[in-house]
């Protein structure tokens, strides 16, 4: 990767970084930043079965899979992965380097920080603020704001004593 610009000059080529989620998206973020620093334009992909309403904004190197519904006035940052069958409601902002798995329901007017993970079938009620580097576990229902680096698991929405800094190294 260090010499990629010699073989594929940024003035002639664009890229998509196809790395899956791991370690709170740290590797994907590292390659995103290095690729941008080399001068590359990064493409995003949205599956054709995803329904996107008007007034949608999306950053670079995003990957949105099949059968999502993305309502009006949604903003998605750079380097975001969104699995299948999600509902992202109106006026929602998703920060850079987040991973939304599948079957997630997000109410309207949600603000999500950077480097967050949302597990399978999680639900986030409307008008919720989620800080940076948070983990929302599978099946969790979020009914109140989530501070930076907090971890919520199970459908009881109990905050765990561990910080996402520690858990991020194992998932």
Which residues make up each language-model segment?
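Phosphate-bearing ligand-interacting subdomains
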Residues: 1-47
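Surface-exposed beta-strand edges and their flanking turn/coil or helix-capping segments
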Residues: 10-13, 30, 57, 133, ...
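Short amphipathic alpha-helical segments
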Residues: 28-31, 76, 147-148, 164-165
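Short, hinge-like loop/turn segments at secondary-structure boundaries
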Residues: 34, 61-63, 168-170
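Structural signal for interior beta-strand "rungs" in well-ordered beta-sheet cores
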Residues: 44-160
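Short C-terminal tail/terminal secondary-structure segment
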Residues: 143, 160-171
């Amino acid at each position: 990767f260090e010499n990629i610009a010699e073989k594929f000059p940024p003035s002639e080529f664009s890229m998509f970084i196809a790395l899956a989620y791991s370690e709170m998206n740290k590797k994907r973020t590292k390659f995103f930043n290095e690729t941008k620093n080399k001068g590359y334009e990064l493409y995003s992909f949205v599956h054709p079965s995803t329904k996107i309403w008007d007034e949608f904004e999306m950053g670079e190197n995003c990957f949105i899979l099949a059968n999502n519904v993305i309502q009006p006035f949604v903003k998605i940052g750079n380097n975001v992965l969104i699995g299948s069958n999600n509902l992202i409601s109106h006026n929602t902002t998703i920060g850079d380097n987040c991973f939304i798995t599948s079957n997630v329901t997000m109410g309207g007017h949600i603000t999500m920080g950077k480097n967050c993970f949302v597990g399978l079938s999680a639900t986030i009620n409307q008008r919720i603020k989620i800080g940076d580097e948070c983990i929302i576990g599978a099946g969790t229902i979020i009914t109140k704001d989530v501070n930076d680096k907090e971890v919520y698991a199970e459908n009881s929405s109990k905050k765990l004593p561990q910080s996402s800094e520690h858990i991020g190294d194992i998932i």
